[in-house]
Protein backbone atom coordinates (compact mmCIF):
# COMPACT_ATOMS: atom_id res chain seq x y z
CA UNK A 1 0.00 0.00 0.00
CA UNK A 2 1.13 3.52 -0.62
CA UNK A 3 2.16 5.74 2.26
CA UNK A 4 -0.89 7.99 1.80
CA UNK A 5 -3.32 5.05 1.99
CA UNK A 6 -1.65 3.74 5.14
CA UNK A 7 -1.84 7.19 6.74
CA UNK A 8 -5.53 7.56 5.86
CA UNK A 9 -6.33 4.07 7.20
CA UNK A 10 -4.58 4.83 10.49
CA UNK A 11 -6.42 8.14 10.79
CA UNK A 12 -9.75 6.34 10.24
CA UNK A 13 -8.94 3.78 12.94
CA UNK A 14 -7.91 6.49 15.38
CA UNK A 15 -11.11 8.48 14.78
CA UNK A 16 -13.35 5.41 15.15
CA UNK A 17 -11.63 4.35 18.38
CA UNK A 18 -12.13 7.74 19.98
CA UNK A 19 -15.77 7.78 18.83
CA UNK A 20 -16.42 4.37 20.37
CA UNK A 21 -15.04 5.58 23.68
CA UNK A 22 -17.26 8.65 23.76
CA UNK A 23 -20.41 7.23 22.12
CA UNK A 24 -22.20 6.14 25.27
CA UNK A 25 -24.47 3.72 23.40
CA UNK A 26 -25.50 6.21 20.72
CA UNK A 27 -25.45 5.08 17.09
CA UNK A 28 -22.78 6.44 14.75
CA UNK A 29 -23.48 8.62 11.70
CA UNK A 30 -20.74 7.56 9.30
CA UNK A 31 -19.86 9.57 6.18
CA UNK A 32 -18.03 8.34 3.08
CA UNK A 33 -17.09 10.82 0.40
CA UNK A 34 -15.88 9.90 -3.07
CA UNK A 35 -15.04 12.19 -5.95
CA UNK A 36 -18.47 11.69 -7.55
CA UNK A 37 -20.85 10.79 -4.69
CA UNK A 38 -21.44 11.02 -0.94
CA UNK A 39 -22.84 8.29 1.31
CA UNK A 40 -24.03 8.34 4.92
CA UNK A 41 -25.20 5.63 7.34
CA UNK A 42 -26.46 5.48 10.90
CA UNK A 43 -24.81 2.40 12.41
CA UNK A 44 -25.40 0.62 15.72
CA UNK A 45 -21.89 -0.63 16.54
CA UNK A 46 -23.03 -2.82 19.44
CA UNK A 47 -25.30 -4.91 17.20
CA UNK A 48 -23.35 -4.36 14.00
CA UNK A 49 -26.44 -3.16 12.11
CA UNK A 50 -27.12 -0.29 9.75
CA UNK A 51 -30.22 1.50 11.02
CA UNK A 52 -30.63 4.08 8.24
CA UNK A 53 -28.73 5.06 5.12
CA UNK A 54 -28.79 7.51 2.24
CA UNK A 55 -26.55 8.31 -0.70
CA UNK A 56 -26.37 10.51 -3.74
CA UNK A 57 -26.74 7.40 -5.95
CA UNK A 58 -30.37 6.74 -5.00
CA UNK A 59 -33.11 7.18 -7.59
CA UNK A 60 -34.62 10.11 -5.70
CA UNK A 61 -31.31 11.95 -5.82
CA UNK A 62 -30.36 11.12 -9.42
CA UNK A 63 -33.72 12.27 -10.77
CA UNK A 64 -33.20 15.73 -9.25
CA UNK A 65 -30.24 16.31 -11.58
CA UNK A 66 -27.56 16.78 -8.90
CA UNK A 67 -24.17 15.30 -9.67
CA UNK A 68 -23.58 13.99 -6.16
CA UNK A 69 -20.23 15.74 -5.98
CA UNK A 70 -21.47 19.13 -4.80
CA UNK A 71 -22.69 20.74 -1.59
CA UNK A 72 -26.35 20.71 -2.69
CA UNK A 73 -26.26 16.92 -3.05
CA UNK A 74 -24.63 16.57 0.38
CA UNK A 75 -27.39 18.70 1.93
CA UNK A 76 -30.06 16.55 0.27
CA UNK A 77 -28.39 13.34 1.50
CA UNK A 78 -28.15 14.73 5.05
CA UNK A 79 -31.81 15.72 5.06
CA UNK A 80 -32.93 12.35 3.66
CA UNK A 81 -30.80 10.42 6.16
CA UNK A 82 -32.12 12.43 9.11
CA UNK A 83 -35.72 11.87 8.02
CA UNK A 84 -35.13 8.12 7.79
CA UNK A 85 -33.34 8.02 11.15
CA UNK A 86 -36.07 9.98 12.95
CA UNK A 87 -38.66 7.67 11.37
CA UNK A 88 -36.69 4.71 12.80
CA UNK A 89 -36.78 6.34 16.26
CA UNK A 90 -33.23 7.70 16.38
CA UNK A 91 -32.76 11.23 17.68
CA UNK A 92 -29.14 11.33 18.93
CA UNK A 93 -26.05 10.11 17.09
CA UNK A 94 -22.28 10.46 17.20
CA UNK A 95 -20.87 12.07 14.04
CA UNK A 96 -18.10 10.05 12.37
CA UNK A 97 -16.51 12.19 9.68
CA UNK A 98 -14.25 9.29 8.76
CA UNK A 99 -11.00 11.23 8.81
CA UNK A 100 -12.29 13.87 6.39
CA UNK A 101 -12.01 17.52 7.32
CA UNK A 102 -15.19 19.08 8.70
CA UNK A 103 -15.55 21.33 5.69
CA UNK A 104 -17.43 21.49 2.40
CA UNK A 105 -19.62 18.47 1.63
CA UNK A 106 -19.08 16.82 5.02
CA UNK A 107 -20.11 19.99 6.86
CA UNK A 108 -23.12 20.50 4.56
CA UNK A 109 -24.33 16.95 5.23
CA UNK A 110 -23.94 17.40 9.00
CA UNK A 111 -25.75 20.75 9.05
CA UNK A 112 -28.65 19.39 6.99
CA UNK A 113 -28.96 16.37 9.29
CA UNK A 114 -29.05 18.68 12.34
CA UNK A 115 -31.71 20.89 10.77
CA UNK A 116 -33.85 17.84 9.98
CA UNK A 117 -33.95 16.55 13.55
CA UNK A 118 -30.76 14.69 14.47
CA UNK A 119 -28.68 15.98 17.36
CA UNK A 120 -24.93 15.54 17.67
From Swiss-Prot:
GO molecular function: 5S rRNA binding; structural constituent of ribosome
Pfam families reported in the protein's UniProt record: Ribosomal_L18p (PF00861)
A cellular component annotation (GO) from this entry: cytosolic large ribosomal subunit
Gene3D superfamilies in UniProt: 3.30.420.100
Highest taxon of the lineage: Bacteria
GO biological process terms on file: translation
Keywords from the UniProt entry: Ribonucleoprotein, Ribosomal protein, RNA-binding, rRNA-binding
Family named by the database record: Belongs to the universal ribosomal protein uL18 family.
Function: This is one of the proteins that bind and probably mediate the attachment of the 5S RNA into the large ribosomal subunit, where it forms part of the central protuberance.
Protein's name in the database: Large ribosomal subunit protein uL18
Protein species of origin: Bradyrhizobium sp. (strain BTAi1 / ATCC BAA-1182)
Highest classification ranks of the organism: Bacteria, Pseudomonadati, Pseudomonadota, Alphaproteobacteria, Hyphomicrobiales
Gene this chain is encoded by: rplR
Amino acid sequence: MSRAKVTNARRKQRVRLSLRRSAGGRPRLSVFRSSKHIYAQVIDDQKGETLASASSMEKEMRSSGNTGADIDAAKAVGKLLAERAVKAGIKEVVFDRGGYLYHGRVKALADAARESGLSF
